[in-house]
């Protein structure tokens, strides 16, 4: 197993989630399966736009659709995705802290500060 196993898949997942509306959709689906009209109401976006974003999420394997009568009900393929999104949203809502100065001489970027011996 290489050290980069899973990085490509993680990158694809994060790219699929890289839109505020898709984050909102995944957040809603974290609470359970929803039909398109329910998602439209919840995220307050036009139906064609919600459907377009659902296609992206379905193509990335984030959501799946199942027919429920005349409608398609969408759900997350993996509950971990809801946690990833919830953590990202929570982190984004935290107050920004100033960047920390490197604590280690090796991290400062100054080659003279690194003791080779």
What label would you give each PLM region?
Residues 23, 49-51, 108, 114:
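A generic alpha-helix propensity feature with a strong bias for hydrophobic helices
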Residues 13, 60, 70-72, 86-90:
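Short, structured secondary-structure boundary patches
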Residues 1-5, 9, 79-117:
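Amphipathic alpha-helical dimerization/coiled-coil segments
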Residues 2-48, 68, 72-80:
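N-terminal helix-turn-helix DNA-binding core of bacterial DNA-binding proteins
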Residues 28, 56-59, 96, 100:
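Juxtamembrane/membrane-water interface recognition
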């Amino acid at each position: 197993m290489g050290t980069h196993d899973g990085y490509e898949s993680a990158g694809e997942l994060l790219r699929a989630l890289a839109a505020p509306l898709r984050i909102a959709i995944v957040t809603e689906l974290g609470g359970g399966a929803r039909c398109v009209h329910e998602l439209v109401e919840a995220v307050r976006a036009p139906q064609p736009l919600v459907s377009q974003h659902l296609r992206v999420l379905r193509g990335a394997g984030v959501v799946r659709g199942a027919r429920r009568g005349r409608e398609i009900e969408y759900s997350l393929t993996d509950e971990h995705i809801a946690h990833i999104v919830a953590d990202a949203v929570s982190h984004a809502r935290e107050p920004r802290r100033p960047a920390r100065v490197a604590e280690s001489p090796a991290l400062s970027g100054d080659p003279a500060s690194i003791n080779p011996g």
